[in-house]
């Protein structure tokens, strides 16, 4: 938001332990309620926010919820029963969402994933590496994104990463760029040969497109790489998300958690990247705008 000079108000912060997560979530509800109740909002629009649908429901504001993770049990149970409309990728099984309390009549499906929105006005910066002053001694460059260790749906140690053994092998063959999620993750990879730790905010879209390969233990950046046609390996340590399977099925993502397989495929991809693959999707931007206006008009 800062990078694109967009005015915004930041509300709340994350917790690490279960107790901290609960307390911080409760505080975000309070802070959001104070912010929202002082204004005349017509619609609450969120992407997998736990707090905004709850605040909107309590203040009788219609809410439009964009969902992409059917495995986020806690978040889905706390939000889906309260949402006016839920926009989901067609590949996600709506019966799974109904188990969390979603009304099937409120589910709106589209072909694609939410990451399509990230590239509506994307302009590739071919000089992104030079602009960042990166020292890249090797011919090939791999971008890596560690797992979302602090997320409620993934119970992992934030001081470790599934990418560590991958880095140990591939650092001899390519420059490694690490985009950590928080300070503890950055510390895991500090001081390693041929490894550069990126410090946000950076133009991640241009970095993804400029790299020869992306290896991600999360989700969003992997799907962005698939859309940009950069070879990508997903080693997400949880169950495979349907939105990831969408790109696997279309030949734009390779999914594995086996170290030997990851390194083998990585070396293959940086030498022989796949040819461009046509991806047919719906216009998610138009869908969100249309449904936002529909909900806003329904309140009047």
Regions found by a protein language model. Name each.
Residues 2, 6-101:
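Active-site and donor-binding regions of nucleotide-sugar-utilizing enzymes
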Residues 2-23, 144, 167-198:
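Catalytic donor nucleotide-activated moiety binding site of glycosyltransferases and closely related
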Residues 4-9, 61, 101-112, 188-201, ...:
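Active-site regions of enzymes building and remodeling cell-envelope glycoconjugates
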Residues 28-36, 183-221:
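Donor nucleotide-activated moiety binding/catalytic core segment of transferases
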Residues 44-50, 55, 65-67, 207-244:
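A donor-sugar binding/catalytic signature common to diverse glycosyltransferases
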Residues 87-158:
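A nucleotide-sugar donor-handling region in carbohydrate enzymes
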Residues 102-134, 250-300:
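Leloir-type glycosyltransferase catalytic cores
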Residues 156-164, 196-199:
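Charged helix-capping and loop-helix junction motifs
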